[in-house]
Amino acid sequence: MLEIKQLNVSFGKKTLFKDASFCAECGHLTVIKGRSGSGKSTFLKAFQFAYDCIYLYEGERIDTLDEENKQKFIYNHLANVHQIPLFIEGMTIGSHIKQLEKLGCKRIPDYEEQLGIKPLENKYPKSLSGGEKTRAAVYLALMRQPEILILDVNWCNKIACI
């Protein structure tokens, strides 16, 4: 279980969250929905320790770890896909996949097919549409087989089917 407690976020005089809490069960789909500009993306940044809060994973405090161990925790347990997916521009999607394979991640043929990854492998991120970038980023995140997958994306049929 992942819990965030006592999350407070303000920008200037505007308070977005005051003493907010959140709980999500691993292996379950949890959806945060709201209007554009309502703070969904800001709230999701708390999962990356971008804000001060109490952060518990399986009952253990993570927010009190030193920076190096927090980063290890994030890498070992979380994968995040941002609204604007992040890629290394000089690498094709296939090169991104190969880099993950070098780190021990495995291809997932079912997701590869469902997300339409094969036709994207020889393309550079800058040549992809927004939807193609999102699908590629989701696939790369899934290759890591995270316990917690955070998707700050617009849903499309191909992503919803996974």
Protein language model regions, located:
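Conserved ABC ATPase "signature" region
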Residues: 105-120
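ABC ATPase NBD coupling module
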Residues: 62-79
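The feature captures the beta-strand-to-loop junction immediately N-terminal to the Walker
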Residues: 33-35
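Conserved ABC ATPase signature
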Residues: 124-128, 132
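Q-loop/switch helix immediately C-terminal to the Walker
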Residues: 84, 90-103
